[in-house]
Amino acid sequence: MKIILATSNKHKVLELKEILKDFEIYAFDEVLMPFEIEENGKTFKENALIKARAVFNALDEKQKKDFIALSDDSGICVDVLEGNPGIYSARFSDKGDDKSNRDKLVNEMIKKGFNQSRAHYVAAIAMVGLMGEFSTHGTMHGKVIDTEKGENGFGYDSLFIPKGFDKTLAQLSVDEKNNISHRFKALELAKIILKILNKG
């Protein structure tokens, strides 16, 4: 069984390939011509399923027998921002790039009079294939701070300190991050489903 990742985000592709290294993984643009997918769901799970369905439906009939489309939708929910940016994490600012998104998060927090806040990451993994549709979830709790620290990672990693740590995700090694991340937890559950489907 082959897995096609329903993302063109290079950081996510690397992270997903590392965690799913027991499987034959292909990035979206290694198999298909890139196309835009409108993420108009109201939850992480809905958006993950929208992306996985779109990629699976773009495969030809032969490819559909060989591939399962796997998608991740994830984001950060900040308590003092009433759970925002949530599903809009990747496009929180007008520019929609990581730095602008982080800057907006910090500015919104400071506007409310806070220099840190409890927060959590959520990841939803969706898998779509001829055998059906499946999804898993993972969370990671901690806090966001108002000063970026660390060079690793992407997204909001340089602002997020996981519970039980005194470093941001961007200060942790890839292995340290992968062992505690929301995406890792959701993918560990997804791997169980994928192994069962592979036997079937």
Curated annotation (Swiss-Prot):
NCBIfam families, alphabetized: RdgB/HAM1 family non-canonical purine NTP pyrophosphatase
Family annotation (CDD domains): HAM1
Location of the active site: D73 (proton acceptor)
Keywords: Hydrolase, Magnesium, Metal-binding, Nucleotide metabolism, Nucleotide-binding
Protein name: dITP/XTP pyrophosphatase
Residues given in the record as substrate binding sites: T7, S8, N9, K10, H11, K12, S74, F154, G155, Y156, D157, K177, H182, R183
EC number(s) reported in the record: 3.6.1.66
Record function comment: Pyrophosphatase that catalyzes the hydrolysis of nucleoside triphosphates to their monophosphate derivatives, with a high preference for the non-canonical purine nucleotides XTP (xanthosine triphosphate), dITP (deoxyinosine triphosphate) and ITP. Seems to function as a house-cleaning enzyme that removes non-canonical purine nucleotides from the nucleotide pool, thus preventing their incorporation into DNA/RNA and avoiding chromosomal lesions.
SUPFAM superfamilies, per database record: ITPase-like
Family in the record: Belongs to the HAM1 NTPase family.
Catalytic activity annotation: XTP + H2O = XMP + diphosphate + H(+); dITP + H2O = dIMP + diphosphate + H(+); ITP + H2O = IMP + diphosphate + H(+)
GO cellular component: cytosol
Positions annotated to bind Mg(2+): E38, D73
